[in-house]
Amino acid sequence: MAACRGLIYLLIRTRLDEAETSAYKLRTRQLVAATSADGIILSYPKSGRTWVETMLSHLYVRRFGLAKTRVLDFQEDRTQFPELPFLFFTHDYAHVTSGRWLIPMRRRRLHFRATPTVMIVRDPIDTAVSMYFQLTRREGHLNDIDLYDFVKLGKGGLVTIVEFMNFWARELPSIHRHLIVRYEELFTSPLEKFGEIVHFFGIEFDPEDVQAAVEFARFENLQELEKAGELSDWRFSDGAVNDEDHLKVRRGKIGGYHDYFSVEQCAELEKFVDAVLDPVYGYGEGRSDR
């Protein structure tokens, strides 16, 4: 078995060009996980994945009678809780260097084809703003660039996010079962949209369990729990945070980018999205939902 794994590693490793060497471990993990998982949750960073994961986790936290603030890992915790489905949460190659590295466009994602996949998307301008605060406030990077310049020009900004989304707009039709969930719809109709995700994966829970998961993951509740350092997952802050821009649960506002940019700057960013982003996601002209 070890020899087989070594051969697979060598085959994969030799296919990576110099620009991709930093991602070979992720690529190997993704090849294995995507083909063996019960389901995939795919997103660009800062699009709402942790929110969905927290709701899914809370379903099983209630079922197993665990502390309500525990956030289960759908891979690592399956040893302790075999009933957990194997759900693979991935940012694809955008996970490398916190989204500042462009996805390799020439690589198909054939290993996703047979696995039911939910893609969570968010208005890319809001995503870019959230990514900026992730990199500057939470991780301490990018102190030499202001918000607008990062969103407009920076790696991990709007161009990168739209490129990621367009790549997956081309790939999704090859996946036998897939579902696109917009952050904005999940925000305005959480019970309905989360219920769609639960149904899509064939997870059986009573309506009151789904309702409880949605209530637990309300923005205000998660933010207060994060401020108090009561959430078990490492991605949340450990408490004592006064600046909300340092929090994982930061604002959760639809169209929040308007609070940071001038009317002219917003128009320029929106014009780019209108012209370049694939319309399959439903963003573009007519931003009444933002």
Where are these regions (language model features)?
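PAPS-dependent sulfotransferase catalytic domain
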Residues: 1-181, 247-290
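Generic hydrophobic-segment detector
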Residues: 33, 38, 192, 203, ...
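A short coil-to-beta-strand element that immediately follows conserved catalytic motifs
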Residues: 67-71, 206-212
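PAPS/PAP-binding and catalytic site of the sulfotransferase fold
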Residues: 50-62, 180-205, 213, 221-222
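Alpha-helical subdomain
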Residues: 168, 196, 205-207, 229
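Surface-exposed alpha-helical segments enriched in charged/polar residues
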Residues: 166-170, 199, 215
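PAPS-dependent sulfotransferase catalytic core
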Residues: 214-270
